[in-house]
Amino acid sequence: MMEIANVSSPEVFVLLGFSTRPSLETVLFIVVLSFYMVSILGNGIIILVSHTDVHLHTPMYFFLANLPFLDMSFTTSIVPQLLANLWGPQKTISYGGCVVQFYISHWLGATECVLLATMSYDRYAAICRPLHYTVIMHPQLCLGLALASWLGGLTTSMVGSTLTMLLPLCGNNCIDHFFCEMPLIMQLACVDTSLNEMEMYLASFVFVVLPLGLILVSYGHIARAVLKIRSAEGRRKAFNTCSSHVAVVSLFYGSIIFMYLQPAKSTSHEQGKFIALFYTVVTPALNPLIYTLRNTEVKSALRHMVLENCCGSAGKLAQI
């Protein structure tokens, strides 16, 4: 008769993180905190500008307002726990906290994959079908695409995370990372995880490979349309319209490909932690800078908002 293992769920997980390099923890704390503050401030400004400036009430900026909210939520699901572990001697996270962390991070990561593909379709419609753009990207479609992105990400997170949470865990409760990821939780299971792995590969295909394919096809059509534009000014405007999105897609998918789609032996586990640190902390902070520095409309709206607030405050002081 087969012996039944002790499969009680642990009350806490130990996040080893960067504990093997204690000399780096203080430096990493300062760096991570700085990037986190920049991320919250920058993404918050993008959301505020997108909602307050009527000139930005277009399909492109409707989707753009979703992206910074995603970035803020994603980094907030991971960074506070990371900062606590870097600062103090405790390197633990509760079982419930770990579950919430991988539910939310999986949900928001999948949502961003679909949203970036949706934004590429919006750019395709704007450049390749300019005369029909307002008809194609009508408000109902934009709302439907945004909802599909959020609900699609939520669905795959609910399925994958629930399957992971149902795994009987036994033995070691140490996670050699700085946040809870489903593949690492699966490694702690004492049963066969083939079903979980199959679901993870299927979700990766649907939410990573297919959106990336749509992005590449969209930009293939866009590149062909831009090359047909005769005037240099027209080509420059078309390039500026897409450059911010291309930069964000390159950062996001570049990190994913470098992290997950390489042969296992080509990247050490320690290198993997720093790559994960890049896409969870650095990328969300860079995205608003990319959109403000490379987008004249956002810069103009931001300048207008600052001047309006400054002039309004000066006027009120003068009346007093």
Swiss-Prot record:
Record's keyword annotation contains rRNA processing: no
Q: Which UniProt keywords apply?
A: Cell membrane, Disulfide bond, G-protein coupled receptor, Glycoprotein, Membrane, Olfaction, Receptor, Sensory transduction, Transducer, Transmembrane, Transmembrane helix
Q: Per the UniProt record, which residue ranges are transmembrane?
A: 27-50, 59-80, 102-121, 141-159, 197-220, 238-260, 274-293
Where is the signal peptide, in residue numbers? none
Glycosylation is annotated at N6
Disulphide bonds in the chain: C98-C190
- Extract the InterPro entries matched here: GPCR_Rhodpsn (IPR000276), GPCR_Rhodpsn_7TM (IPR017452), Olfact_rcpt (IPR000725)
Q: Which GO terms describe its molecular function?
A: G protein-coupled receptor activity; olfactory receptor activity
- A GO cellular component annotation in the UniProt record: plasma membrane
Q: Where would you find this protein in the cell?
A: Cell membrane
Q: Name one Pfam family in it.
A: 7tm_4
What's this chain's function? Answer: Odorant receptor.
Write down what this protein is called. Olfactory receptor 2C3
